Swiss-Prot record:
Species lineage: Bacteria, Pseudomonadati, Pseudomonadota, Betaproteobacteria, Nitrosomonadales
Signal peptide stretch: none
Binding-site residues for Zn(2+) 1, renumbered to this chain: 67, 100, 163
Gene that produces this protein: dapE
This protein's record includes keyword Hydrolase: yes
Protein name: Succinyl-diaminopimelate desuccinylase
Length: 376
């Protein structure tokens, strides 16, 4: 299986699938699985290509999910080899997307192939959900596929997202949830004027400062068994004309919550508005929800992946909810058990992105054993 997985990973890396361009990756996967009896549904929204392909109609349905798009390479001259010409060097496979996440996609496919070859009469069903819009806006990708599946009543029992989750070695980390992300665009209005005549103006920086300080010091929640406490941080702040003798007419702040299941979107919004209102600010606040938190407590899926990891690596994986958002947040709407597991993430989005060649086969074997743990 290792040569097959490595070869497929190299074929995928060679495709210049910069968001939202899939560059033929999904067709390659679709054609490979067609011979196994998979029925495919290509869903295009705008410039984004998505693939939903499934074999079987019985429960439980095990889904592998991932993305074919990759981030820009950065200066190509800083790479030791062309980022879209996959190279094996010193025991590592180099190329853009090697870790995030074309090796996982290749491992999905070869794991499924070997599982079906070994167990043609397995119970349940197997599916893949793949998008070319995970690294970008993520508005025409997985979220749209999930909406389509909801419309036709198609639910997933177990989903493994192939994001690169491991830190020091393959098998050390499973992501069993992610924090939510809620952003705010806050404008506090004052009255512009000459700085020598402050009685004829109202400085929004001065009026907003106490409220900003309170927001920064607020304990939003204490987290829980799976999540750290919710955080609130300012990412951008701007006020003034650039002159030293003008009191600005308004101040603008961009802020972001990374929040746990101990808080809700509505509770966070309400507390922010309460603080701003109590300080008597004249303001406008526009909210943007990038994703709600999701959590899969230890259970059937986490145990199945953990057992497969132990068998292949001898490592007891840690369950973690750290890091940014992923497409798991969308899939959680139609699947009660979602986890993420993939290769090491030390080089993702970096120059000379790579994955250890030995991990390519081991990752495919972990995915195949997970299928055995769930469908036999």
């Amino acid at each position: 299986m290792s040569n097959s997985t490595l070869t497929l990973a190299q074929m995928l890396i060679a495709r210049r699938s910069l968001t939202p361009d899939d560059d033929g990756c999904q067709k390659m996967i679709m054609h490979r699985l067609a011979g196994l009896g998979f029925k495919s549904d290509s869903m295009t929204f705008g410039e984004v290509e998505n693939l939903w392909t499934r074999k079987g109609s019985d429960a439980p349905l095990v889904c592998f999910a991932g993305h074919t798009d990759v981030v820009p390479t950065g200066p190509v001259t800083q790479w030791d080899s062309d980022p879209f010409t996959p190279v094996v060097r010193d025991g590592f496979l180099y190329g853009r997307g090697a870790a995030d996440m074309k090796t996982s996609l290749a491992a999905f496919v070869t794991a499924i192939e070997e599982f079906i070859e070994l167990h043609p009469d397995h119970k349940g069903s197997i599916a893949l959900l793949i998008t070319s819009d995970e690294e970008g806006p993520a508005v025409d990708g997985t979220v749209k596929v999930v909406e389509a599946l909801q419309t036709r009543g198609e639910m997933i029992d177990y989903c493994i997202v192939g994001e690169p989750t491991c830190t020091n070695q393959l098998g050390d980390t499973i992501k069993n949830g992610r924090r939510g992300s809620l952003s705010g665009n806050l404008t506090v209005r004052g009255i512009q004027g000459h700085i020598a005549y402050p009685h004829l103006a109202r400085n929004p920086i001065h009026t907003a400062a106490p409220a900003i300080a309170e927001l920064a010091q607020t304990v939003w929640d204490n987290g829980n068994e799976y999540f750290p406490a919710t955080t609130w941080h300012i990412s951008n702040i701007h006020g003034g004309t650039g002159a030293t003798n003008v009191i600005p007419g308004e101040i603008n702040l961009l802020f972001n919550f990374r929040f746990s299941t101990a808080s809700t979107v509505d509770s966070l919004k309400a507390r922010v508005h309460e603080i701003l209102d109590r300080h008597g600010l004249d303001y406008e606040l526009i909210w943007e929800l990038s994703g709600k938190p999701y959590l899969t407590p230890r259970g059937t899926l986490a145990d199945a992946v953990s057992a497969a990891i132990r068998e292949v690596t001898g490592i007891e994986p840690e369950l973690s909810t750290t890091g940014g958002t992923s497409d798991g947040r969308f899939i959680a709407d139609i699947c009660q058990q979602v986890v993420e597991f993939g290769p090491r993430n030390a080089t993702i989005h970096k120059i000379n992105e790579s994955v250890e060649v030995a991990d390519v086969e081991r990752l495919a074997r972990i995915y195949r054993l997970t299928l055995e743990n769930l469908l036999l």
